[in-house]
């Protein structure tokens, strides 16, 4: 099977990070993590997973999404992956993902470099998803192939404060004109309850 390395950029994700890491533990050979100053048990939870081979912790740095993504990318590339999977700490792959994902990567689409996964937005209850409006069309760029890619892959800055809304894939990645929408889905807990929704709104307002 292809060698997949996962990379996470997280902060205070102790509520969901264990589920997230468990969901990819049989898919990703190794996992690298950039922790942006967590004050909860996030790092301690991550350290309990043997697949987590590197945790870079930073504190009191100004928010800079591009800087963090480039640091994470360097960490992941140093592990010599065939693919890089990018996840947030509140995202959990569904349990039927492994066989389906490897079949797509190696058999169905061996020459495609970019893959989107469908997000299911968990809402108020563990088995309840929102599927109205924009919540029914949420595809996220999550996985990219490294074969024949430039050696100097990087994310570029944006015109937004803190380089927010940075690209999901490195800007000089080859093959952006063809993106496969995978059958693999993931659960997104970022809007699970009113407290989280308010927290997300306030964070975005600051930007």
PLM features per residue range, with description:
Residues 65-70, 94-207:
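Catalytic-site signature of metal-activated, phosphate-bearing donor transferases
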Residues 3-5:
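Cell-envelope/extracellular polymer assembly enzymes that use nucleotide-activated donors
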Residues 15, 60-69:
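A short, glycine-/small-residue-rich helix N-cap motif at loop->alpha-helix starts
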Residues 80-94:
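Short beta-strand-to-loop acidic/aromatic patch adjacent to the donor-nucleotide binding site
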Residues 35-45, 61-62:
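A conserved acidic beta->alpha catalytic loop
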Residues 10-27:
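Short, well-formed alpha-helical segments that are part of the catalytic scaffolds
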Residues 70-83:
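Active-site nucleotide-sugar/metal-binding loop of Leloir-type enzymes
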Residues 24, 29-37, 57-58:
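Short beta-strand/loop segment that forms part of the nucleotide-sugar
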